[in-house]
Amino acid sequence: MTWQAYVDNNLLGAGFASAALLGAADGSVWAHSAGFNVAEGKAITALFQKDGAAFATGIHVAGKKYMAIKSDTRSAYGKLGAGGVVCVKTLTCIIVAVYDDKLQPGAAANIAEKLADYLIDNNC
């Protein structure tokens, strides 16, 4: 499966409004949904350097700042209005998935974390 297929099938297909996969090493964009431009790749990779990193800065994705509600070396979750963002680091990439009011925060986290587990289990 291509990286774009993970975005299209596993994230957008599960109800996320927009999503991207970034390289964990440098924050480069590997795949993204149409019109979703994640220019903050380096800043997103920095969120996973130490527990709590996102609490000081918030989570900046596609020009929006999300208030951090979880931040550790694997996952960073943020809220903005009725929606939010879930970022999860695997061995090689970072899942960045934005949801709106059509997807509950717990469901959003569960979907992204399960995809991350699958990728990790497959050495990705």
Swiss-Prot record:
Belongs to the profilin family. This is Profilin-2. It is found in: Cytoplasm, Cytoskeleton. The lineage of its organism: Eukaryota, Amoebozoa, Evosea, Eumycetozoa, Dictyostelia. Coiled coil: none annotated. It comes from the Eukaryota. Binds to actin and affects the structure of the cytoskeleton. At high concentrations, profilin prevents the polymerization of actin, whereas it enhances it at low concentrations. By binding to PIP2, it inhibits the formation of IP3 and DG. It comes from Dictyostelium discoideum (Social amoeba). One of its GO terms (cellular component) is actin cytoskeleton. The gene is proB.
